Swiss-Prot record:
This is Cell division protein FtsX. It holds the Pfam family FtsX_ECD. It is found in: Cell membrane. Keywords: Cell cycle, Cell division, Cell membrane, Membrane, Transmembrane, Transmembrane helix. The gene is ftsX. Part of the ABC transporter FtsEX involved in cellular division. InterPro entries: ABC3_permease_C (IPR003838), FtsX (IPR004513), FtsX_actino (IPR047929), FtsX_ECD (IPR040690). The chain crosses the membrane at residues 22-42, 172-192, 220-240, 268-288.
Amino acid sequence: MRFGFLLNEVLTGFRRNVTMTIAMILTTAISVGLFGGGMLVVRLADSSRAIYLDRVESQVFLTEDVSANDSSCDTTACKALREKIETRSDVKAVRFLNRQQAYDDAIRKFPQFKDVAGKDSFPASFIVKLENPEQHKDFDTAMKGQPGVLDVLNQKELIDRLFAVLDGLSSAAFAVALVQAIGAILLIANMVQVAAYTRRTEIGIMRLVGASRWYTQLPFLVEAMLAATMGVGIAVAGLMVVRALFLENALNQFYQANLIAKVDYADILFITPWLLLLGVAMSGLTAYLTLRLYVRR
């Protein structure tokens, strides 16, 4: 097929169905943009989780007897527990925090509680850094019930709750994107049907003179995929605008405090090929199936 003929057929299709083409482009842009937003949230969560996992520690709280009478972990019970922790293969580092140090650390982090929190409220503890914070349950189980142990707290459980919110946001974005994608598919199918109907005479003549089905259907496929490509371009541009005007300002304080990973333009560029593949594949497959069902002769 000559490129000039193909280009002319595609442009003719756009001119005859301007409104529907624009609607399809915008719907594709919205669905792909939401899908891209979900992918960015997933990347943000994964990168931020890595930041927090590097800081995650398990805290082994000691009983009142040890906390009140041993400020430097010199008693037999405290030494035995520390040795048991240090000899574990899954432990990277251990440090002892006596009652006074625990109180000072808590007041430094939460000064508003200085007047209501007493020193006796904070037990002594071992702060334990694990080799793999993801595998903390074995350590927690081994420590609970040991002589001198009051309780075990692992920060990863708190982090999991935090990132459950981000997981929920990404799931919501994917769900809305799916609904929009269904709308885009229906628009593509409708556009292809209308385009084929408006050019039914030309198609009939070409088939009479021996043109193959592929020869007559290719312009419709290209038309749908080109419109989808435009939609993907708008979606990517929209993500960059949102990143520049909203995320950069709204999350700047979190970035500076290294509380979450930064969403950069490189992240958007990274997901762009996948968004393009999604948009083009969705439009091309929909157009092909529509033509197979609608244009039977």
